[in-house]
Amino acid sequence: PELPEVETVRRGLAEHLVGRTIRKVEVLHPRAARRHVGGDLDLIGRLRNKSVTGVRRRGKYLWLDVADARDRAAVVVHLGMSGQMLIARAGAPDHTHLRIRASLDDGNELRFVDQRTFGGWHVDDYVEPEDTVAQSLSLIHI
């Protein structure tokens, strides 16, 4: 997906994810978590029982801000060429190319579907959002 499509995905995810808690994560294809330094089991552990506090976009990457009482982090998602982030009811039939499933506290699931497996998820340190408006105003004289 190109940048406008990634922004559309971000907006849709924000409506469904902010305020939700991730109860369980399943990595169904190892390539989907290949960029996570600790491997898929570490990714699962880092996300369990985390609340989604924000959904941001940095270039073509989606950043799902997550936190609990001890830790703040971000799920960094790259959609690759064919990746999709879908919201589905728990128990709905799985898509053929389902790679990661995150069960949410409201009975829905966040599903990462990627036919070509070029995309993926990794957990990274939380980074404060940049104040792009202030930056733009400071550069206006140029």
For every predicted segment, state its role.
Residues P1-R58, W63-D65, A69-R72, R101-S103:
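Extended, highly charged segments
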Residues D71-I140:
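Phosphate/anion-contacting hairpin/loop surfaces
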